[in-house]
Regions:
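A secondary-structure boundary/capping signal
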Residues: 2-3, 42, 85
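Conserved C-terminal active-site "lid" loop/helix of NAD(P)H-dependent oxidoreductases
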Residues: 37, 47-49, 53, 69-107, ...
Length: 113
């Protein structure tokens, strides 16, 4: 399991809230009318291995059988770090971040025993 490339997972509810906030600014325009491209990513830098460990915790599983690999993943080249520049949204005071462990617990809740 890759413990090398950095991901910045975003919760779908955070993305929905950002889209809502931007649309509200278009419906009720003030001095900041959004236009152009906006980027978003989660705050937590995580590898796939980190995410699997969080999922194991949600299911109360050991997870020690999964081993992290500290080298680039084989196959198609992937960026080392997927962090995006979120400053345009932050300049509009738009910022929604669900911690990964909380978000993954919510998403996987129906599969828990």
């Amino acid at each position: 399991m890759s413990d090398y490339e950095i991901r910045r997972p975003s919760h779908v509810n955070d993305i929905a809230s950002i889209v809502y906030d931007l649309s509200q600014m278009l419906i009720e325009p003030g001095e900041n009318v959004p236009s152009g491209i906006y980027q978003w990513c989660g705050l937590q830098p995580l590898t796939k291995y980190d995410m699997v460990k969080s999922m194991a915790k949600v299911f109360n599983l050991d997870g020690n059988h999964v081993k992290g690999v500290k080298e680039p993943s084989p196959g198609a080249p992937r960026p080392f770090d997927t962090t995006m520049d979120t400053s345009r949204l932050e300049d509009l005071n738009i910022s929604h971040h669900t911690p990964f462990e909380k978000g993954i617990e919510e998403c996987l809740q129906k599969w828990r025993n």
